[in-house]
Amino acid sequence: MSSFQCVKGTRDILPDESLLWSFVSSHFHHVASLYGFREIRTPMFEYTDLFQRGIGATTDIVGKEMFSFQPDPAGRSITLRPEMTAGVMRAALQNNLLAQAPLHKLFYIGELFRKERPQAGRQRQFNQCGAELLGVSSPAAVAEVMSLMMHFFGALGLTGLTLKVNTLGNAEERLAYREALQAYFAPHRAMLDASSQERLEKNPLRILDSKNPALQELIAAAPRLYDYLQEASLRDFEKVLFYLTERRISYTIDYRLVRGLDYYCHTAFEVTSNELGAQDAIGGGGRYDALARELGSATDIPAVGFAVGMERLLIVLEKQGLLGNRHARPPRLYVVVQQQEMLDHALQLVWRLRNGGIRSELDLAGRSMKAQMREANKLGALYALFVGASECASGKYGLKNLATSEQTDLSIEAVMQLLHDHVTE
């Protein structure tokens, strides 16, 4: 055993588990493409001030959870990305995407990094898949993005999910609500934990996101942002709910839902699973019209998006028995080398078979024929092809059906034709 271990908060994804990740990723690729979204890939690290301005200086992510470093003493600080949206918007602005077309539908699958206390479904290096719709934030656009997320979960077969929605209004409405929250929580300062006391001064909306059991009754009685909304914001939210109802997407209005990032406005949403504990969210998102201006745009750019935590998603899929027994596709053919001096010839055959689109395997360790046959059966090969001196001389090879034990002598061309005609993927 090596004296080296993976860093705390990280983990290895070995080949069998990697198949599960590919299963989930391929579903997301498929569903996102159905909705017209195209993949974007951004760097794993960005300048630190991108996240400070984009996510918000008062958030826990910026204040406590970022991995930042300064590679050049005279240069700017760099941070491993803790979330994807700011980087996607930066890429859109830098590359003038919205000047090329007024609407962009983008999706991503990527790794992120946060200094969190490692626990089930929450690591310091983790993965998200998500989508961003840039250029439009009408109620129809918001419903489109939410539909994509719920369609993805449905395609995986998930049950027991709750879609929670809320409206955070516009900046003016949130300012009035912030003042109301400060007035409400201030007399109860002594009841607040240290984190909530800090949030009371910087951003009291974050108190609503507290999971501290001792504060839940106090939070439940707090003023509702909904009561500070003006008619335009109310109409916008009601139209989003109308579209969800039209699409037969069930939802619950949660007036305490604020999400953990400062750039959200108007509609915010979150999906939770009854398979998880207190940390029950597996995905969420919302509108973020002002993010572009925070990153240097001359104007706001309407936008809406979501992200799904893939580690938590896999936990739920496993608990609901939706991952099944997924294995790598077996080779169609296992080439059995009868004498080691025939290895070069066998390698040429395998090269030809693979170029012909036939998954083929052979032994590179010089094992006995008996050991090679055991390996062929272990891998689930459909056929074994025997390569020895007499076969090489005649140009015909023994092809054995490992299910029926029937064996026939065929040329390599006939072997390839048989496999193409009678063996499906």
UniProtKB/Swiss-Prot annotation:
One of its GO terms (molecular function) is histidine-tRNA ligase activity. Its EC number is 6.1.1.21. The keyword Signal does not apply. It holds the Pfam family tRNA-synt_His. CDD domains: HisRS-like_core, HisRS_anticodon. GO terms for biological process: histidyl-tRNA aminoacylation. One of its GO terms (cellular component) is cytoplasm. InterPro entries: aa-tRNA-synth_II (IPR006195), aa-tRNA-synth_II/BPL/LPL (IPR045864), Anticodon-bd (IPR004154), Anticodon-bd_dom_sf (IPR036621), His-tRNA-ligase (IPR015807), HisRS-like_core (IPR041715), HisRS/HisZ (IPR004516), HisRS_anticodon (IPR033656). It comes from the Bacteria. Signal peptide: none annotated. Gene3D superfamilies: Anticodon-binding domain, Bira Bifunctional Protein, Domain 2. It is found in: Cytoplasm. Homodimer. Belongs to the class-II aminoacyl-tRNA synthetase family. PANTHER family: HISTIDINE--TRNA LIGASE, MITOCHONDRIAL-RELATED, HISTIDYL-TRNA SYNTHETASE. This is Histidine--tRNA ligase. It comes from Chlorobium chlorochromatii (strain CaD3). The gene is hisS.
